[in-house]
UniProtKB/Swiss-Prot annotation:
Gene Ontology annotations for the cellular component aspect, listed alphabetically: plasma membrane
Swiss-Prot/TrEMBL GO biological process terms: potassium ion transmembrane transport
Family that this chain belongs to: Belongs to the KdpC family.
Domain of life: Bacteria
Matching InterPro entries: KdpC
Key words, A-Z: ATP-binding, Cell inner membrane, Cell membrane, Ion transport, Membrane, Nucleotide-binding, Potassium, Potassium transport, Transmembrane, Transmembrane helix, Transport
Name of protein: Potassium-transporting ATPase KdpC subunit
Task performed by this protein: Part of the high-affinity ATP-driven potassium transport (or Kdp) system, which catalyzes the hydrolysis of ATP coupled with the electrogenic transport of potassium into the cytoplasm. This subunit acts as a catalytic chaperone that increases the ATP-binding affinity of the ATP-hydrolyzing subunit KdpB by the formation of a transient KdpB/KdpC/ATP ternary complex.
HAMAP family the UniProt entry points to: KdpC (MF_00276)
UniProt topology in membrane: Single-pass membrane protein
Predominant cellular place of this UniProt entry's protein: membrane
Species of provenance: Leptospira interrogans serogroup Icterohaemorrhagiae serovar Lai (strain 56601)
Length: 190
């Protein structure tokens, strides 16, 4: 009898907790997010002329010289990391390959910022450091036949400051910077 009583209580508890944590809690939190944070709750989608062109939260692959490039991705801009340790020969070779490529494309530079060499942990980081943007300004300006000053002005407009004045570092959202380039100086069609 005690055994059946324990089973009955366990099943009721399972059903109640499933209802609370599996149905009610997700509905309440989703409703709260959509009510008070509609832009963020829908994925921070960037919409231009009625068309979704990306998300502020997810990196996109830009390969044309006319655009700023994001951090490299271990999984070709899908979620995931290489999980290679710092002693991994494959990781070292990949970093050297990236460094060689970047220095060839930016011959006036001698040092590559670390965030352009190392993939982000998630593979989806949409930001680069201000140093990485400055590293690329000459290439982007030459490719678009603009002055570095014109590009620098846009970089300064989209640069995000540290949160709450002390958390993290300044950063630049690559998608927003490239969209700003297109809106100010025209879309590159090649």
């Amino acid at each position: 009898m005690i055994f059946l009583n324990i089973i009955s209580i366990s099943i009721r508890l399972l059903l109640i907790l499933t209802l609370i944590t599996g149905i009610l809690y997700p509905i309440v939190t989703t409703g709260f997010a959509e009510r008070f944070f509609p832009f963020r709750s829908s994925g921070s989608r960037v919409v231009i002329q009625g068309k979704i062109v990306g998300s502020e939260l997810i990196a996109q692959k830009f390969i044309k010289d006319e655009y700023f490039w994001p951090r490299p991705s271990a999984m070709d801009y899908a979620a995931g990391a290489s999980n290679a340790s710092v002693t991994n020969v494959f990781l070292k070779a990949k970093v050297e390959e990236r460094k060689k490529f970047l220095l060839e494309k930016h011959s006036e530079q001698t040092q590559v910022p670390p965030d352009l060499l190392f993939a982000s942990g998630s593979g989806l980081d949409p930001h680069i450091s201000p140093d990485s943007a400055l590293f690329q300004i000459n290439r982007v300006a030459k490719s678009r036949k603009l002055t570095e000053g014109q590009i620098l002005r846009l970089k300064n407009i989209v640069e995000e400051s540290v949160e709450k004045g002390y958390i993290g570092e300044n950063r630049i959202n690559v998608l927003l910077l490239n969209l700003k380039l297109d809106s100010e100086f025209g879309i590159i069609l090649k």
